[in-house]
């Protein structure tokens, strides 16, 4: 049978639409709930030998809501605890759109998280500045709002600093990090803050916010891309190392394609020659 050009194009279009529909259906019904554990090695310049191999369980962008159920959050907590980490870090966006109905529930779901040397949290752009931090603190988390704390571990010290999402000016960030003498880990929801961190010679940054792109199409890449240094994984800016997690939840559309949710176990690796 002779196939006309119009018929061929129609066939390709139908096939493409069918494939996309199938991918979206899978992303809505399966992939967005398949929370997994990933491992990342983060090279850190000047890391003391005693802190080489320090393990940090990192959870971010939970977005607990009608479309991100308690079961997903509970699985993330279970995976983090299974790693027996030195530190636990939460990277912000615990709810979506400042929805106060989920503030107390998500903090309680995260409460079982534990680590030998502390559990720390920062806020994201979907978190309010009062209810969310109060709920986290009630459940045992140290919430860093443009603050820094010195953590003693393995006979050494690690400066853990955290900034609000809207803290962006170099002088504001410099104020948080002023007089930091030890290796500094900056918790910043937005990975674009690595620019300011690198200018201040911060050792390492942990971020979320990007969701890894959330929808990543073959041959196209992430649909929602901005000027992020990296959408997911490890990057380096001057002497500052950055890790960006894909996070747990979703926003805008309850779908993930080629971008599964993750709990990240980040292991610090000493780079003494940098």
Question: How would you name each of these model-derived features?
Answer:
Residues 1-19:
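N-terminal secretory signal peptides and thylakoid transit peptides that target proteins
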Residues 20-54, 67-70, 75-78:
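C-terminal segment of N-terminal export signals and the immediately downstream linker at the start
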Residues 44-56, 149-160, 236-241:
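Beta-strand-turn-beta hairpins that frame and shape the catalytic cleft
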Residues 53-63, 157-165, 185-189, 241-246:
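Active-site-proximal beta-strand elements of phosphoester/diester hydrolases
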Residues 54-134:
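Membrane-embedded segments
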Residues 59-60, 88-92, 118-125, 144, ...:
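Active-site neighborhood of phospho(di)ester-bond hydrolases with catalytic His/Asp-centered motifs
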Residues 131-134, 138-141, 145-147, 152-188, ...:
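Binuclear metal-dependent hydrolase catalytic cores centered on His/Asp/Glu-rich metal-binding motifs
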Residues 191-267, 271-273:
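Conserved beta-sheet core of the metallophosphoesterase superfamily
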